[in-house]
């Protein structure tokens, strides 16, 4: 809408005037965004989404400020303009599109690799959605994976809300949950899960 375009124009003017662009991320989703423990401060945030943020800042002639937050807080931060943008493995959804501008790449990408991550040695036990009946599934609130769990799995699935994928993987590998709703891309970092 015309009103949205004015908001974006004002944001661009603000970025150019201050020389700073503020980006929200939830740095717990390697390889997109995560923390390099050998680095400090803003340099400790690394990954593909961080590099994209740096590129955008460079093209705008601005300094990139990274603000970390729980994934479920990102949409509100963008909607309230407390940050200029979010690059945090945000898959497209109609709800998100109503409250923020989304790039075409996110709309075309990331939503196809969603699923339930399970221990690799139990993968053969889970071949249909019904196989998760009565199971405990960890999921981040506000994600498309949450929508997957609540709409496509049996109603008796026990949902365990988590604040980060790292928490979910820890719960899965220690047997506290039967699965974690997540991305197959994320699973590539953990050979013990499928």
Where are these regions (language model features)?
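Extracytoplasmic small-molecule ligand-binding "clamshell" domains
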Residues: 3-90
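Short helix-initiation/N-cap motifs at beta->coil->alpha
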Residues: 65-77, 124, 159-174
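Short Pro/Gly-enriched coil loops immediately N-terminal to beta-strands
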Residues: 79, 100-117, 165
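Alpha-to-beta junction loops
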Residues: 22, 61-63, 79-89, 135-136, ...
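Short loop->beta-strand "edge-of-pocket" segments that line small-molecule binding or catalytic clefts
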Residues: 21-25, 129-143
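Flexible hinge/capping segments at coil-to-helix
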Residues: 106, 118-137
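Ligand-binding cleft/hinge of the Venus flytrap
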Residues: 33-40, 53-62, 107, 145-162, ...
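A ligand-binding cleft/hinge motif common to bilobed small-molecule-binding domains
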Residues: 73, 90-99, 148-152, 166, ...
């Amino acid at each position: 809408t015309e009103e949205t375009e004015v908001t974006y124009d004002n944001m661009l003017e603000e970025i150019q005037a201050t020389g700073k662009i503020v980006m929200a991320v939830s740095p717990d989703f390697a390889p997109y965004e995560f923390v390099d423990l050998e680095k400090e401060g803003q340099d400790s945030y690394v990954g593909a989404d961080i590099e994209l943020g740096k590129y955008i800042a460079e093209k705008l002639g601005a300094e990139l400020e990274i603000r970390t937050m729980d994934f479920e807080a990102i949409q509100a931060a963008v909607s309230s303009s407390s940050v200029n943008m979010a690059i945090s493995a945000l898959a497209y959804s109609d709800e998100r599109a109503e409250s923020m501008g989304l790039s075409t790449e996110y709309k075309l990408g990331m939503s196809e690799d969603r699923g339930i991550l399970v221990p690799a040695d139990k993968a053969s036990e889970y071949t249909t959605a019904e196989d998760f009946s009565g199971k405990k599934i960890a999921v981040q609130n506000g994600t498309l994976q949450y929508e997957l769990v609540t709409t496509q799995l049996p109603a008796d699935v026990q949902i365990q809300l988590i604040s980060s994928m790292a928490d979910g993987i820890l719960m899965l590998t220690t047997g506290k949950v039967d699965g974690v709703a997540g991305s197959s891309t994320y699973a590539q970092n953990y050979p013990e899960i499928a």
